Swiss-Prot record:
Its main location: virion. Pfam families: DSPc (PF00782). It is an enzyme of class 3 (hydrolase). Induction: Expressed in the late phase of the viral replicative cycle. InterPro entries: Dual-sp_phosphatase_cat-dom, Prot-tyrosine_phosphatase-like, Tyr_Pase_AS, Tyr_Pase_cat, Tyr_Pase_dom, TYR_PHOSPHATASE_DUAL_dom. This is Dual specificity protein phosphatase OPG106. Keywords: Host cytoplasm, Host-virus interaction, Hydrolase, Inhibition of host innate immune response by virus, Inhibition of host interferon signaling pathway by virus, Inhibition of host STAT1 by virus, Interferon antiviral system evasion, Late protein, Protein phosphatase, Viral immunoevasion, Virion. Belongs to the protein-tyrosine phosphatase family. Non-receptor class dual specificity subfamily. The gene is OPG106. GO terms for molecular function: protein serine/threonine phosphatase activity; protein tyrosine phosphatase activity.
Length: 171
């Protein structure tokens, strides 16, 4: 087995058959200005203690937040095993990086705050990694976020796409 196949096997195996996690209900602060949440968190964003500048909506449904100065960015993504989310990684991670640098709080969400938004958050954190071992960093981030939130990037296709871009292609 070559190195890339071994890494992919180990990463998918170590994150695949875990006990079923409970869906998260609370918003999670990921970095100083990047937050991960669900649809309900987005609907409550205008009244949140955090003064969000942006909401990144990754659901299929477009919406507005009445009486709010929050800018909504909509990327309609389907949560299934055929959706290619990797084509959005570079743009989303660059956007989240700018929000962090400019101190502009952003809430990234999908319906449950697990797969689509979790994948983009994981991609963002992986893109910031300057460590020499992306495989270990992936496992650290994945399991840390799962411990914090419960369910986190349960879609095997989304995990595979992140592993291919940020772990396999880095080695």
């Amino acid at each position: 087995m070559d190195k890339k196949s071994l890494y992919k096997y180990l990463l998918l195996r170590s994150t695949g058959d875990m006990r079923r996690a409970k869906s998260p209900t609370i918003m999670t602060r990921v970095t100083n200005n990047v937050y991960l949440g669900n649809y309900k968190n987005a609907m409550n964003a205008p009244s949140s203690e955090v003064k969000f500048k942006y909401v990144l909506n990754l659901t299929m449904d477009k919406y507005t937040l009445p009486n709010s100065n929050i800018n909504i960015i909509h990327i309609p993504l389907v949560d299934d095993t055929t959706t290619d989310i990797s084509k959005y990684f570079d743009d989303v991670t660059a956007f989240l990086s700018k929000c962090d640098q400019r101190n502009e709080p952003v809430l990234v969400h999908c319906v449950a705050g697990v797969n689509r938004s979790g994948a983009m958050i994981l991609a963002y954190l992986m893109s910031k990694n300057k460590e020499s071992s992306p495989m270990l960093y992936f496992l650290y981030v994945y399991h840390s976020m799962r411990d914090l939130r419960g369910a986190f990037v349960e879609n095997p296709s989304f995990k595979r796409q992140i592993i291919e871009k940020y772990v396999i292609d880095k080695n």
